[in-house]
Every structure is written in C-alpha cells, then in structure tokens.
C-alpha cells in the first residue's frame, strides 16, 4: 500500500498494460489510463445504485508518473459523495514496476462524476426504485 492512502479503497480493476497501449514516447498513453479510470469509477458507482450510470464529468485528473509496459496497474476507488441523481468517485491509480513488484507507485488520481439514469436516459434518483 502507498503511504498516506486510506484503507477505505476498493480495488475495482487490476491490469497489466501492453505495448499496444503505448504513446510515441514508449510509455502508456494517457487515454488508456483515462479509459480504465472511467471503468473503475463506474464499478464503484454501480455499487451504490441499482440504476445504470453515465459519466458526466472527469473533474480532475492528475498524472503523477508514467506507466510503463509490463507494469501491474491497480485502480482503487472510493465513494466521495452521493447527490440526488449523482455519484462522485475518487480513483487512485497505482503501478507496480517489474523491477520492484512489492512497491506501489502512485501514478494518477482522478475524480469522476456519474448520473443515475433510467432506460430512456433520463436522470433518476440514485436511491430511488
């Protein structure tokens, strides 16, 4: 565990990133990380409502360090808040390098907002039936 992290995190996704995920610099493309953040945060949001959820905002994304091919990357989520129709999720992204598999490096953090919707795509209360 990374120093300073809370134990209230939920491991939503863990992946090993591959050469197909790289950018022109040979590190993992930020868009790949963003996509996985969105998936991980959606898993957390769905833990708090029976409705479908859609992404409405990525309020803040901070890339702290690059991710390399072969890194084991974990996406930890934490519920930040629940509004009437919205759910805000914080995501911490941690990489474990091949040369130091027991050391987690915080590589990215983000805050993502979802809205609960019905089958027609209309907003519905998170806790409603």
Label the predicted regions.
Residues 2-57, 112-129:
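Hot-dog-fold acyl-thioester-processing enzymes
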Residues 56-66, 74-79:
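Conserved interaction-surface patches within small, structured recognition/assembly domains
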């Amino acid at each position: 565990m990374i120093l300073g992290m809370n134990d209230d995190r939920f491991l939503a996704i863990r992946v090993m990133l591959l050469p197909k995920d790289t950018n022109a610099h040979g590190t993992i493309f930020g868009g790949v990380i963003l996509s996985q953040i969105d998936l991980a945060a959606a898993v957390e949001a769905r833990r708090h409502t029976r409705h479908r959820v859609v992404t409405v905002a990525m309020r803040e994304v901070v890339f702290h360090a690059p991710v390399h091919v072969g890194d084991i990357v974990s996406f930890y989520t934490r519920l930040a808040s629940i509004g009437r129709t919205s759910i805000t999720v914080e995501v911490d992204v941690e990489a474990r390098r091949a040369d130091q598999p027991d050391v987690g490096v915080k590589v990215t953090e983000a805050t993502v907002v979802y809205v609960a919707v019905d089958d027609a795509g209309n907003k519905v209360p998170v806790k409603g039936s």
